[in-house]
Amino acid sequence: MKRNFPKLIALSLIFSLSITPIANAESNSNIKAKDKRHVQVNVEDKSVPTDVRNLAQKDYLSYVTSLDKIYNKEKASYTLGEPFKIYKFNKKSDGNYYFPVLNTEGNIDYIVTISPKVTKDSSSSSKYTINVSSFLSKALNEYKDQQITILTNSKGYYVVTQNHKAKLVLKTPRLEDKKAKKTESIPTGNNVTQLKQKASVTMPTSQFKSNNYTYNEQYVNKLENFKIRETQGNNGWCAGYTMSALLNATYNTNKYHAEAVMRFLHPNLQGQQFQFTGLTPREMIYFGQTQGRSPQLLNRMTTYNEVDNLTKNNKGIAILGSRVESRNGMHAGHAMAVVGNAKLNNGQEVIIIWNPWDNGFMTQDAKNNVIPVSNGDHYQWYSSIYGY
């Protein structure tokens, strides 16, 4: 027995070492067997710069917790799935890195979008910006145990499955030009299959982290009663949606609607002239005055402290943005609403924004005046109208 004892120890060590990775993988994922059917997204290259990956891993939980508190969600645990990329119809990446945020059921709750900074970005602490929103999370959850490619054009975002069927899963209200309508088509066969690598976006890449402490300690301030009651379609009424949302919140009512606001201000327009009309800052201020408010124009982005004070005092803020990519077209200018603000665990200050195109909110660095939006464009926050 004594002579065999060392052999038994060696065998037990070999056995324990051989099963350790599997055991750790199971404990790290913490997902039931029925939920282990992963969504696989085709990518040309799975590589992600180290500083991009580190930024996502370091900050995602604080960003997610700020949105959880805005949505009045309960405390939860999250981890990141494998990052993926989105491609344009010419098969070139849109330039962003997308990190899915997984809950313990194996579903995607949020998307962390990390983008290279654009020229007009006012902050300078990093080469990248980080924003968190729901974005494509709901759509991706519908493709468990499937291999897909995500493509984008001026109409929105498409999921292309292995049988080469494409579905528009997220529309953007931006109008494409007539030439684009004639020439753009859904890539098939050879186009899609050239993306050889696969990102398992619902597969946990690290242990789940509870946001219990972050939830209790993190400061979040929301404009009371702010709700998403309607979203912008194929029209130029972003300012109408923005003012309606802010006034519904500050008056705690449901009576304001974008179309009615636009009709009030442009009663003589009909057809496409009415559908694609927009508003000037002067018209936005005038409408606020007719509703018992005293809106003020500020020719810059509001600071974090200004947002904090105005939001606490139930005064809504409209964002006026100018598109960085192009000054032409209906959406060259765009209005959005400030929902609130938060201070993350690392001390970073963020502003919570609602884009009328979206069904959810997004985070924005309070020192960054360039806002990435859900159609891939960027808007420079050049002015604010506060006091709705």
Swiss-Prot record:
It is an enzyme of class 3 (hydrolase). Prematurely activated/folded staphopain A is inhibited by staphostatin A (ScpB), which is probably required to protect staphylococcal cytoplasmic proteins from degradation by ScpA. One of its GO terms (molecular function) is cysteine-type peptidase activity. The active site is at C238, H334, N355. Residues 1-25 form the signal peptide. Cleavage leads to the activation of ScpA probably by an auto-catalytic manner. Residues 26-214 form a propeptide. The catalytic maturation of ScpA appears to reside outside the cascade of activation started by the metalloprotease aureolysin (aur). This is Staphopain A. It comes from Staphylococcus aureus (strain MRSA252). The gene is sspP.
